[in-house]
Protein backbone atom coordinates (compact mmCIF):
# COMPACT_ATOMS: atom_id res chain seq x y z
CA UNK A 1 0.00 0.00 0.00
CA UNK A 2 1.37 3.41 -0.98
CA UNK A 3 0.93 6.18 1.53
CA UNK A 4 1.40 9.66 0.16
CA UNK A 5 2.98 12.15 2.52
CA UNK A 6 3.29 15.88 2.57
CA UNK A 7 6.68 16.54 0.88
CA UNK A 8 7.47 19.31 3.37
CA UNK A 9 7.74 18.01 6.92
CA UNK A 10 6.00 20.20 9.45
CA UNK A 11 7.37 20.91 12.90
CA UNK A 12 5.30 19.34 15.64
CA UNK A 13 5.07 21.50 18.73
CA UNK A 14 4.96 19.54 21.97
CA UNK A 15 1.88 20.26 24.04
CA UNK A 16 2.51 19.59 27.69
CA UNK A 17 0.44 21.23 30.37
CA UNK A 18 2.78 22.69 33.02
CA UNK A 19 0.87 20.86 35.75
CA UNK A 20 1.33 17.53 33.89
CA UNK A 21 5.07 17.90 33.30
CA UNK A 22 6.91 15.91 35.93
CA UNK A 23 9.91 13.69 36.21
CA UNK A 24 8.83 10.04 36.04
CA UNK A 25 12.15 8.81 37.45
CA UNK A 26 15.14 10.85 38.54
CA UNK A 27 17.87 8.33 37.70
CA UNK A 28 19.88 7.90 34.50
CA UNK A 29 18.33 5.73 31.78
CA UNK A 30 19.47 6.80 28.29
CA UNK A 31 17.76 5.50 25.17
CA UNK A 32 14.89 3.94 27.12
CA UNK A 33 12.97 0.97 25.78
CA UNK A 34 9.63 0.03 27.37
CA UNK A 35 8.16 -3.48 27.23
CA UNK A 36 4.47 -3.92 28.07
CA UNK A 37 3.68 -7.23 29.79
CA UNK A 38 0.89 -8.74 31.88
CA UNK A 39 3.04 -7.81 34.89
CA UNK A 40 3.13 -4.12 33.95
CA UNK A 41 5.68 -2.04 32.09
CA UNK A 42 9.42 -2.64 32.17
CA UNK A 43 11.86 0.05 31.07
CA UNK A 44 15.46 -0.75 30.13
CA UNK A 45 18.18 1.75 29.28
CA UNK A 46 21.86 2.50 28.90
CA UNK A 47 23.89 3.78 31.84
CA UNK A 48 27.31 5.31 31.04
CA UNK A 49 28.68 4.16 34.40
CA UNK A 50 28.42 0.54 33.25
CA UNK A 51 27.21 -1.61 36.09
CA UNK A 52 24.25 -0.78 38.31
CA UNK A 53 24.64 -0.91 42.10
CA UNK A 54 23.86 -4.66 42.09
CA UNK A 55 26.70 -5.35 39.61
CA UNK A 56 24.36 -5.99 36.68
CA UNK A 57 24.24 -4.01 33.44
CA UNK A 58 21.33 -1.92 32.09
CA UNK A 59 18.99 -0.32 34.60
CA UNK A 60 15.52 -1.89 34.65
CA UNK A 61 12.49 -0.05 36.01
CA UNK A 62 8.93 -1.22 36.60
CA UNK A 63 5.60 0.62 36.45
CA UNK A 64 1.94 -0.32 36.45
CA UNK A 65 0.79 3.04 35.06
CA UNK A 66 3.80 4.51 33.15
CA UNK A 67 3.72 7.49 35.52
CA UNK A 68 5.43 6.06 38.58
CA UNK A 69 8.60 3.99 38.08
CA UNK A 70 10.51 1.84 40.55
CA UNK A 71 14.12 0.78 40.02
CA UNK A 72 14.66 -2.98 40.10
CA UNK A 73 18.45 -2.73 39.78
CA UNK A 74 20.27 -4.05 36.74
CA UNK A 75 18.88 -6.46 34.15
CA UNK A 76 21.91 -8.19 32.57
CA UNK A 77 24.44 -10.38 34.38
CA UNK A 78 27.92 -9.32 33.18
CA UNK A 79 29.08 -11.74 30.44
CA UNK A 80 31.98 -13.94 31.57
CA UNK A 81 34.22 -12.97 28.62
CA UNK A 82 33.65 -9.25 29.20
CA UNK A 83 36.70 -6.99 29.06
CA UNK A 84 36.94 -4.59 32.03
CA UNK A 85 36.61 -1.58 29.72
CA UNK A 86 33.58 -2.94 27.81
CA UNK A 87 30.62 -0.65 27.23
CA UNK A 88 27.04 -1.79 26.74
CA UNK A 89 24.43 0.10 24.75
CA UNK A 90 20.78 0.21 23.75
CA UNK A 91 18.98 -2.85 25.12
CA UNK A 92 15.62 -3.94 23.71
CA UNK A 93 13.60 -6.89 24.98
CA UNK A 94 11.13 -9.19 23.21
CA UNK A 95 8.89 -11.84 24.75
CA UNK A 96 8.79 -15.07 22.75
CA UNK A 97 8.60 -18.78 23.44
CA UNK A 98 7.87 -18.32 27.15
CA UNK A 99 11.09 -16.37 27.74
CA UNK A 100 12.34 -12.81 27.47
CA UNK A 101 15.17 -12.02 25.05
CA UNK A 102 17.37 -8.97 25.46
CA UNK A 103 19.25 -7.73 22.39
CA UNK A 104 22.06 -5.22 22.97
CA UNK A 105 25.42 -4.06 21.66
CA UNK A 106 28.77 -4.25 23.39
CA UNK A 107 32.26 -3.10 22.52
CA UNK A 108 35.17 -1.09 23.87
CA UNK A 109 34.21 2.56 24.34
CA UNK A 110 32.53 3.64 21.15
CA UNK A 111 34.37 1.16 18.91
CA UNK A 112 33.98 -2.41 17.71
CA UNK A 113 30.42 -2.88 18.90
CA UNK A 114 28.66 -6.14 18.08
CA UNK A 115 25.14 -7.34 18.81
CA UNK A 116 24.47 -10.01 21.42
CA UNK A 117 21.42 -11.66 22.95
CA UNK A 118 20.64 -12.71 26.51
CA UNK A 119 17.60 -14.50 27.94
CA UNK A 120 15.61 -14.55 31.18
CA UNK A 121 12.46 -16.16 32.52
CA UNK A 122 11.19 -12.84 33.94
CA UNK A 123 11.15 -9.39 32.27
CA UNK A 124 13.18 -7.93 35.16
CA UNK A 125 15.90 -10.54 34.65
CA UNK A 126 18.43 -11.53 35.47
CA UNK A 127 19.28 -11.87 31.79
CA UNK A 128 22.18 -14.18 30.95
CA UNK A 129 24.23 -13.70 27.81
CA UNK A 130 24.08 -16.52 25.24
CA UNK A 131 27.78 -16.26 24.41
CA UNK A 132 26.97 -15.65 20.73
CA UNK A 133 28.12 -12.65 18.67
CA UNK A 134 25.14 -12.03 16.35
CA UNK A 135 27.13 -9.81 13.97
CA UNK A 136 30.67 -11.28 13.80
CA UNK A 137 31.34 -10.14 10.23
CA UNK A 138 30.30 -6.51 10.74
CA UNK A 139 32.79 -4.04 12.22
CA UNK A 140 30.31 -1.88 14.18
CA UNK A 141 26.67 -2.63 14.99
CA UNK A 142 24.34 -0.94 17.49
CA UNK A 143 20.69 -0.26 18.27
CA UNK A 144 19.07 -3.69 17.81
CA UNK A 145 15.29 -3.59 17.47
CA UNK A 146 13.60 -7.01 17.27
CA UNK A 147 10.01 -7.26 16.03
CA UNK A 148 7.45 -9.85 15.02
CA UNK A 149 6.57 -9.55 11.33
CA UNK A 150 3.06 -9.94 9.90
CA UNK A 151 3.84 -13.55 8.93
CA UNK A 152 4.74 -14.40 12.56
CA UNK A 153 8.51 -14.59 12.02
CA UNK A 154 10.92 -12.60 14.16
CA UNK A 155 13.22 -10.06 12.54
CA UNK A 156 15.55 -7.33 13.73
CA UNK A 157 16.56 -3.89 12.55
CA UNK A 158 19.92 -2.51 13.65
CA UNK A 159 22.45 0.14 12.67
CA UNK A 160 25.86 -0.63 11.18
CA UNK A 161 28.74 1.57 10.07
CA UNK A 162 32.04 0.91 8.34
CA UNK A 163 34.64 3.42 9.38
CA UNK A 164 37.11 3.97 6.58
CA UNK A 165 40.63 4.19 7.96
CA UNK A 166 42.11 5.97 4.94
CA UNK A 167 39.51 8.75 4.85
CA UNK A 168 37.34 10.64 7.27
CA UNK A 169 34.04 9.50 5.74
CA UNK A 170 31.59 6.93 7.00
CA UNK A 171 30.38 4.36 4.48
CA UNK A 172 27.28 2.22 4.95
CA UNK A 173 27.22 -1.51 4.22
CA UNK A 174 25.21 -2.76 1.28
Question: Where are the language model's segments positioned?
Answer:
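Carbohydrate-active catalytic/glycan-binding domains of CAZyme proteins
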Residues: 1-174
